[in-house]
Amino acid sequence: LFLISGGASSLCEVLEDGWTLAKLQAATQEKLANGASIAEINAMRKQLSKIKGGKLWQFISERPVSCLLISDVQGDNPAVIGSGLLFPAPTDRAFSWEIVANNQQMLAAMQASQILPTIQILPEFLSSDAEQAAKSCVDFLKDQAEGVYIWGGETTVTLPANPGRGGRNQHFALAAALALESTENI
């Protein structure tokens, strides 16, 4: 039984010969710094890995395999979740899989909980540059009624030559704060 979720790409690895963790981290950091999408980063990870892209099967005995997936990717493609450790699956193996949770289910659960009086779940999956996505969200909010608006997604960021600290979510939040600076009631 496997449980594979978002983040598995970073936590689970057996590198191809000639690669070290330090080299992989440097290659990943370079891609992240240049605004690469998670799909582009995971494509690189699959090329450099002995287990991603369905290659984990070579280390699994002939027993039946079940896989539960928690998706953090747009479209819930199992070959993308965790860089597809078990996908594509061999056709001659006893294999079952199911997506047990995803971004939309989490957002719907938040809305159904009614913890806050007015929660609006936005269907747009934020996947552009963090600063552009923040501006787009702020522009949208300027014309909306009072309430809580929730988006899901995974943005990108292009780092300057001398980057500061933080990550994509912090960059998004700070860009939104700057865009909201002269706006009232948001």
Give the residues covered by each predicted segment.
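N-terminal loops that bind phosphate or other acidic moieties
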Residues: 1-151, 155-186
